Amino acid sequence: YSSVMLSDTAGIDKDEVCIRLEQATDTAGLKKEGFTISTRGNMTTVTGNDGNGVIYGCRELIDHVGQYKDLKFPAQLTDAPEMVLRGGCVGIQKMEYLPGRGVYEYPYTPESFPWFYDKEQWIKYLDMLVENRMNSLYLWNGHPFASLVKLEEYPFAVEVDEETFKKNEEMFSFLTAEADKRGIFVIQMFYNILLSKPFAEHYGLKTQDRNRPITPLISDYTRKSVAAFIEKYPNVGLLVCLGEAMDTYEDDVEWFTKTIIPGVKDGLKALGRTDEPPILLRAHDTDCKMVMDAALPLYKNLYTMHKYNGESLTTYEPRGPWSKIHSDLSALGSIHISNVHILANLEPWRWGSPDFVQKAVNAMHNVHGANALHLYPQASYWDWPYTADKLPDGKREYQLDRDWIWYKTWGRYAWNCHRDRSSEVEYWDKQLGDYYGTTSAEAGDILEAYEQSGEIAPKLLRRFGITEGNRQTLLLGMFMSQLVNPYKYTIYPGFYESCGPEGEKLIEYVEKEWKKQPHVGELPLDIVAQVVEHGDKAVAAIDKAAAAVTRNKEEFGRLQNDMHCYREFAYAFNLKVKAAQRVLNYQWGKDLNELDAAIPLMEQSLDHYRKLVALTDSTYYYANSMQTAQRRIPIGGDGGKNKTWKEMLVHYENELANFKANLQLLKDRAAGKVTESAAEIKPLSAANVKILNGLTPVKLATGANLFSNVPGKVDALAAELEGLTAYRMNGDVQRKEGTTIEFEAAAPVNLLVGYFRDDQKKYAKAPKLETDASANDYGQAEPKLTNAVRIAGMPLANVHAYHFEAGKHTLLLPKGYTMVLGFTDAQVTPRNAGLAGAEETMDWMFY
């Protein structure tokens, strides 16, 4: 090809194709980013409604050449995107905490993020966005300001050395300039309230503390940071997350309206700008509508964002309370962004179902009222830019290379989700055929494998999961205890009501069977049967395609292995669910034969899990890319442990051994070989601590008064708690200020805190990892004793344990009534204290 001036086109040979690019001068009634292509003879004219429209018109011609291998461009074609923003996100975060730092605290440095300074890699990513007609790039980080701007009032707040600071300036300028050339809007995300580490240390503060109040110092520092960022990087937008280190919704409103928006305005004023660039507000861990109602009178150009299926991909039929959040925000009339977030249930295997994605994007429009897309990587978000794959030569595979179909599907349907299904099958057959060097017909088997396997993880999580969040890594499996008593593990509220069709949990299904009650919606045994069928079909299709592959053979081998992984996982899960059904049958009918029948099912499940171990041991470094204490299901992921199937196999084998031993115990009891005796529960030993902030001690016993402002006394409490030194609190003060405990311990201790089981605003919220990433910093995420304290006129309470090493400590608890039950130097054995009444659950059979 060659470039010619428009004045010279008369001399073009009739056999040559001339492409003319122009931008519309009269844009009245034209859609943003749209284009028109018209061909007359050998002249094809691309007219963009704006600069982006010209770019996307050119992409249309490139796609035509790739699809049809000719230059016979359309006589007339007009197109424009359905979604206003269409973008991908990159996390400037890591799989583990940096030494001495908390969650999300990652300064921009070459040591932590060498890839961030790789310009060639950024060009490749930006070009990928353009290829898929995406127009936005989101950078996620806890507190980016201390890596990118300097404040005259707080010069010590910068978290990087001078050389790195200059590199960061240069990279940000480069990235925004290259993005701008491609019509891409760069948006920096940040959490609140996070402080720079040197700033926090200078003033004796924590970098983040969910339960501290907003102070003038913290507000001033953040306001000035935002202003300096806006002034220095005027073409970079801000995505504001009002969690996960803010206490109340009222604090969120105050922070956004009195710190963030004024900071943006200060930056604009310094530039002499009177326009309002968009500020994006996440509806995560906040009441977004409440914030928007307060903020819109102050700043008009506000966009909203909410997670599509939470932190997983579970359905293209969303409903319930989480869908209402979307529709309420959409009704405000601003741009509403659907966030395809984390994808915890898809890690780490390949996923790329065009049919699922097209239906999901339709749901974003029709159910949620969204008109923009924010897209996470398909897997390994925390390990960007690498995948979890182990390559034979020890090198790492890049996500952009492996997961090209992920970005292509979401980009294609964010542009237009109303495409004809039969034409789409032809399109994807051609795409896959070109990539793997097969005919379109042969590539149809690869598409079939993607679409069959694409149903497995979504269906299983929405019907059996504890949460859609980072807290659970589905594809490592689940314990029997989690299947027979999911409530013990704190099912995330709203998950089952929002992230799939109406249906039943296994525990509900069995109860209805025994009570002869009608079933409703999607049923657990149907789902496990379906995923087995999906797995069989995916493997049959991918194996059938194998002989035809002539290109990217190694990558095809990895895709083929993933399909086999999905199949073995589906088989293992199916058999485990059937075993759990038998155990639940025993709970209702007390027939020991039901427990006997569970054993071969568990053994067969393990056989398939061992095959899964064999398929993954040499092919994957890990399943989950978030490798911290936040990962709790199926088991804690503290310190990067329990992240492979090989590690999990040992736990699942122990689970079966425990079950067999406990079953034998039941049989011995039934045969009269064991005499029943109530296990003696001894009180916990009190730890010797020195209280530094004047709390009022009270001996913990029946009749004790734990609140100075309410008459109710302790009616009953778990035997473990008898005799501990608790502390009398004022509930009204707790509601207004939260609870502070300052103490000194000579040896490691556990502080026991009681949270009331009630969602009224007056009661402090128990730790919840879905909305507070620091909720397990002290090992407090799960209750140690459930139904353990009863006070007259108040709800039952669960007891959580906060572990501290020797030394001086200050703990802030959330606002609301909560009980400080004392310190112990003993380990607390988890159990249901049963003050709610006798409720036998079957999870004990597996311990």
Region spans (language model):
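Glycan-recognition and processing domains
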Residues: 678-735, 838-847
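C-terminal non-catalytic alpha-helical accessory regions
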Residues: 102-103, 377, 398-644, 651, ...
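A short beta-strand element within beta-rich, extracytoplasmic domains
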Residues: 747-759
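Extracellular and analogous surface-interaction loops
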Residues: 730-733, 737-750, 800-809
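Catalytic-core regions of glycoside hydrolase
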Residues: 68, 112-115, 135, 166-169, ...
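Contiguous ligand/interfacial binding patches
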Residues: 764-829
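Feature activates predominantly on carbohydrate-active enzymes
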Residues: 27-215, 234-235, 338-340, 361-362, ...
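Acidic, contiguous N-terminal accessory segments
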Residues: 1-41, 74, 705-713
